[in-house]
Each structure stands twice: as structure tokens, then as C-alpha cells.
């Protein structure tokens, strides 16, 4: 992305969200914690006082929980102020290719209740854009998040006008990123 490539070009070269999810799946929770603590210490030393840690690179229930559990551990061991965001709807996990509505149900009915039960996230975020999640799916996910006490955020309209900005407004989202 920093080299000006589109998401499609990055994916064609073997990168992107799904590639990152594969790599995260292979990383133990302890290794992820150690890596994240090193980064937290580095940014603290450079003057950062507050940081948001998002999930969204797990795309399975266990891997999304792993990311957020690590975030909570870092929060407990770092002087940084850390806020956490559940972004299970960053992309459709590989196991659900061609079954997007089932993946949305997984996010709402399995992932989100577990995230809430463990108190792992302050916010819920959705990538509402062409090729990712529709405004209707985004609406369902944000509504579910509200029921669990997670204020909504949204990534939208980066690749095309998706209508995500309207969903953000309808839900009083805390932030709406991209909107290009």
C-alpha cells in the first residue's frame, strides 16, 4: 500500500489481509505478545501516549480472540493508554470464501459474544467497501456491537462509494476512515 499498489494488486502478489491472517495464525500468542510489547515500548520511547490495537487479521474466532487477548496483556504491562477494537469484519476468512453471509453470522453470533464476554474490545469496526462488506452487513454488525456495548467505527468508501458513510452516520459511529 505504501508503494501505491491497490488492494487487488497487493493480493495478486500474495499479500493483503488474507496473507497477514495466514501469518498471524502461525504465530503463537506468546510470540505475538512479545512482538507487540517490543513495538509498544518503541512507540512509547518515541513519545506516543495512546494507541489503538485492532484485531482484523485473525478472521477466525480463535485468532481474533488471540489478537485481542494479546492487546489486553500489553495494556496491563505497558505505560501506554491502549484502546482495543474488534475488527472481525475486515475481510471474509478463507474458510468462508463464497459464503459471506455465513461469515457475517459468525462475526455476530460467535465472535462478538465471546469478545464481549471476555471484555476484550472497546469498539467494533467494519470494512464496508466494494469487495468486502455491504452496507446491510455493516449495519447488522454495528447494531450487534451496540448491543454488546461496543461503539461503532467504520472503514468505508476507499475503493468505491459503498454507502458505508451513510451507515456510519446512521449509527453515530465514533469514526469513519478513508471516505475517499
Predicted features along the sequence, with ranges:
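Active-site-adjacent C-terminal substructures of enzyme catalytic domains
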Residues: 150-152, 158-180
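Metal-coordinating catalytic core of metallo-dependent amide/deamination hydrolases
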Residues: 8, 14-44, 49-162
